[in-house]
C-alpha cells in the first residue's frame, strides 16, 4: 500500500479541524455549576416575627471583649435589642429578661457573634467540579452569612438567580452580592470605549447587578475607560472593585484607580506598584512568561521588595491617601499562605473529610489549572 502524501494528510487534518470547530460552535462548553438545591424540611427556619436568643456570651465584632449572658431580640430579621441579663455562672433572674418570642433559642454556654462577610467568595467553578451546595454549606458552617462574588463566574443570570433564591430562603446559602466583569452577559462584546463602559454599567444596573469587578482585559485599565465606568457606577450607586492584573497595572495602579473612584481592590495586585519610588514596571526576569503561573505568582510575591519600604515617606503617603479616599483592601491572605508553606497546606487535617475529591484533583501541581502552580515550587520560592 502506498504511503499517503503530505498533501493528503494536510487535507485530512484541515477537515478534522473544521469538524472540531463546527462541533464546538454547536456544543458550547458548560459554563455554570449546578445551582443550590431547593431547601429541604429541617434545613433552617425563619425569619420570625420575634426571635429571642437567650443566655449567650456575645462578641459584637466591633472590638469589644466577650460579654454575657445576654438576650438578643430579633424582630422581622433585624436586631431590636441586646440586653445584659446577669453574670457568669449565676442564675439569671427572669424578671429582667425581654418578653417571650415566637421562637426562642437557648444559647447558654454558647457564643454568638455577627455573621462573617466574605468579600472575595467565588461560588465554585466547573473546572473544580464544585456544586453550589458544597460551597454554600462550607460557608454557612464557618459562619459566613454574606458573600460578594467578584466576577460572577457562573454567569450574570445564574448568579442573580441564586441571589434571589437565597433572599427568599429557597436555598441554604449566604446573602449574595453580585459583582460582574464589564462586558460579560450582554450582546455587545468587549468594553473598549468610555461610551461602551457607561452603557454596560447601565445595562448591568437594569439586570440587577450590585457592582463590578475590573480584571483581565487591557482595555479596562485604560484610564479613560476605567474612569468612565467608575463615574457611571457611582451615579447609579453601584459598587466597584478590581483585580489589578499584571497585564494592565502599568497603565493604572491601585492609587490611581482609587483617585478615580474605585471602591476596593481584590488580593493586593496594584498596591506595590503604587509604592514604586524608582520604577514604573516591576523587574521581570528575562525568561518571565505571565501564562506560566509559577512565574506569575512567584514573581508577584517578590514584587514587594521592589516597593518603598514600610514606614517610608512614600509608603505613608500612599496609605494616608487610600484611607482618606475611604478605599477598601480585600487582601485574601489565606490563599497565599500555601505559597509560603506548601506542605503544611497540602497536609491540613481537614482535607480528608471536607475537601471534595474533584477539588483535590484540580489543585494537584498543574501547568493549566489556575492556582495550581506547584509543579516547580521550591524552598527558595517560599522564603523569598
List PLM regions with ranges.
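Active-site neighborhoods of metal-dependent hydrolases
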Residues: 200-218, 264, 271-384
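Bacterial N-terminal signal peptides
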Residues: 11-22
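Histidine-rich, glycine-flanked metal-binding segment
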Residues: 34-39, 43-47, 58, 64-113
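Metal-associated gating/positioning segment near the N- to mid-region
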Residues: 97, 102-170, 189-195, 249-257, ...
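Histidine/acidic-residue-rich, glycine-tolerant segments that coordinate divalent metal ions
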Residues: 170-173, 177-256
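Histidine-centered divalent metal-coordination motifs
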Residues: 55, 110, 116-124, 243, ...
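Bacterial N-terminal signal peptides that target proteins for export
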Residues: 1-13
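Divalent metal-dependent hydrolysis catalytic cores, especially in the metallo-beta-lactamase
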Residues: 135-156, 173-184, 206-219, 238-241, ...
Amino acid at each position: 500500500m502506498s504511503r499517503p502524501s503530505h498533501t493528503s494528510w494536510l487535507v485530512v487534518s484541515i477537515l478534522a479541524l473544521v469538524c472540531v470547530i463546527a462541533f464546538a460552535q454547536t456544543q458550547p462548553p458548560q459554563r455554570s455549576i449546578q445551582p443550590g438545591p431547593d431547601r429541604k424540611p429541617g434545613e433552617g427556619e425563619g425569619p420570625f416575627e420575634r426571635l429571642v436568643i437567650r443566655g449567650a456570651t456575645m462578641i459584637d465584632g466591633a472590638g469589644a471583649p466577650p460579654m454575657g449572658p445576654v438576650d438578643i431580640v430579633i424582630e422581622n430579621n433585624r436586631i431590636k435589642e441586646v440586653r445584659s441579663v446577669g453574670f457568669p455562672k449565676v442564675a439569671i433572674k427572669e424578671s429582667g429578661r425581654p418578653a417571650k418570642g415566637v421562637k426562642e433559642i437557648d444559647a447558654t454556654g454558647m457564643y454568638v457573634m455577627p455573621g462573617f462577610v466574605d468579600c472575595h467568595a467565588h461560588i465554585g467553578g466547573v473546572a473544580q467540579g464544585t456544586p453550589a451546595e458544597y460551597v454554600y454549606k462550607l460557608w454557612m458552617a464557618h459562619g459566613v452569612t454574606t458573600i460578594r462574588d467578584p466576577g460572577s463566574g457562573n454567569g450574570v443570570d445564574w448568579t442573580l438567580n441564586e441571589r434571589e433564591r437565597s433572599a427568599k430562603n429557597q436555598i441554604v446559602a449566604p446573602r449574595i452580592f453580585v459583582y460582574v466583569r464589564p462586558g460579560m452577559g450582554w450582546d455587545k462584546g468587549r468594553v473598549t470605549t468610555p461610551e461602551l463602559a457607561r452603557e454596560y454599567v447601565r445595562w448591568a444596573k437594569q439586570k440587577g447587578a450590585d457592582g463590578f469587578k475590573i480584571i483581565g482585559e487591557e482595555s479596562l485599565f485604560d484610564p479613560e475607560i476605567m474612569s468612565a465606568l467608575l463615574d457611571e457606577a457611582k451615579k447609579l450607586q453601584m459598587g466597584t472593585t478590581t483585580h489589578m492584573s499584571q497585564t494592565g497595572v502599568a497603565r493604572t495602579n491601585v492609587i490611581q484607580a482609587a483617585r478615580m473612584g474605585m471602591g476596593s481592590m481584590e488580593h493586593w495586585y496594584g498596591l506595590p506598584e503604587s509604592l514604586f519610588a524608582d520604577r514604573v514596571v516591576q523587574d521581570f526576569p528575562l525568561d518571565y512568561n505571565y501564562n506560566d503561573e509559577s512565574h506569575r505568582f512567584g514573581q508577584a510575591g517578590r514584587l514587594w521588595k521592589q516597593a518603598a519600604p514600610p514606614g517610608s515617606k512614600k509608603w505613608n503617603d500612599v496609605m494616608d491617601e487610600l484611607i482618606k479616599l475611604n478605599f477598601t483592601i480585600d487582601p485574601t491572605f489565606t490563599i497565599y499562605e500555601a505559597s509560603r508553606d506548601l506542605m503544611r497546606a497540602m497536609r491540613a487535617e481537614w482535607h480528608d473529610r471536607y475537601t471534595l475529591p474533584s477539588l483535590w484533583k484540580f489543585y494537584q501541581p498543574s501547568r493549566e489549572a489556575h492556582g495550581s502552580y506547584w509543579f516547580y515550587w521550591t524552598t527558595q520560592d517560599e522564603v523569598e
